[in-house]
From Swiss-Prot:
Disulfide partners: C21-C36
Job description of the protein: PLA2 catalyzes the calcium-dependent hydrolysis of the 2-acyl groups in 3-sn-phosphoglycerides.
Protein name (record): Phospholipase A2 3
Signal peptide as annotated in the record: none
Cofactor(s) this protein requires: Ca(2+)
Main location: secreted
A GO cellular-component term linked to this record: extracellular region
UniProt EC number: 3.1.1.4
InterPro entries: PLipase_A2_dom_sf, PLipase_A2_His_AS
Annotated active site: H39
Tissue note: Expressed by the venom gland.
Keyword field: Calcium, Disulfide bond, Hydrolase, Lipid degradation, Lipid metabolism, Metal-binding, Secreted, Toxin
């Protein structure tokens, strides 16, 4: 929902390289494939 989406901008630690990360915002092997699933940058677009 919009409240949860807004939290992305409230807590910058959930951003990785300017993209939304759905799982804690950490850039590690476990979360990398799920990082930025809201944005096309995850898929090289």
């Amino acid at each position: 929902n919009l409240w949860q989406f807004g939290r992305v901008f409230v807590y910058p630690d959930v951003l990785c390289k300017g993209c939304y990360c759905g799982w804690g915002g950490r850039m590690d092997i476990y979360t990398y494939s799920r990082c930025c699933f809201v944005h096309d940058c995850c898929y090289g677009k």
